[in-house]
Amino acid sequence: LVNGTAAIHLALILADVGEGDEVLAPTFTFVATANAISYLKATPHFVDNNEDTLGVDPKKLYEYLNKFTKQKDGKCINLKTNKIIKAIIPTHVFGHPCKIDEIVDIARKFNILVIEDAAESIGSYYKNKHTGTFGLMGALSFNGNKTITTGGGGAILTNNKEIAKKAKHLSTTAKLDHKWDYLHDEIGFNYRLPNIN
């Protein structure tokens, strides 16, 4: 993809986040996280960070969700706003993994999808597993200040073949295969990595 922000944006679309939804994000993250949520007219809802990992604090996350949400029809509802909390974007800050296994377990309990922001943690492991591979999707960045760079760029990681197929389709302007005609079956994005990168 063209950058890490596009990766987060597209991952949110693939997670069916839309207008009126809420997405949990850490208080310590790059502005791209809140921007990508806002592009979809969803609301960024910030959760506390752990001072040891700098990532989302699983204990505080659980306490908050347990106290201020309810389950209705398989969805997590914020009791204060009555909006659906559809996803959480935990960030692995400065290459240091957050307690992602605990966050994923809590998210599952509350029916919240996990999209990892692994933009700063390419090559990092947590409990012998690469960061960005614990949730439904992971977002990477290849910006000039990252461990691996292409001058710019990003990627989505997923083990879900349908999500991968849809990500490829949407990131290439939703163009259908055709020998000579430009046919598009839905609104897509020109998010593919530039040829020169």
Residue positions per predicted region:
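Conserved N-terminal alpha-helix of the aminotransferase class I/II PLP-enzyme fold
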Residues: 1-6, 28
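Short, acidic/glycine-rich phosphate-metal binding loop used to engage nucleotide
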Residues: 4, 50-51, 128, 144
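Short, conserved alpha-helix that lines the donor NDP-sugar binding/gating region
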Residues: 8-12
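PLP-dependent aminotransferase-like
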Residues: 13-93, 97-109, 113-118, 125
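Short, hinge-like loop/turn segments at secondary-structure boundaries
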Residues: 63-64, 130-134
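Active-site region of PLP-dependent enzymes
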Residues: 121-127, 134-197
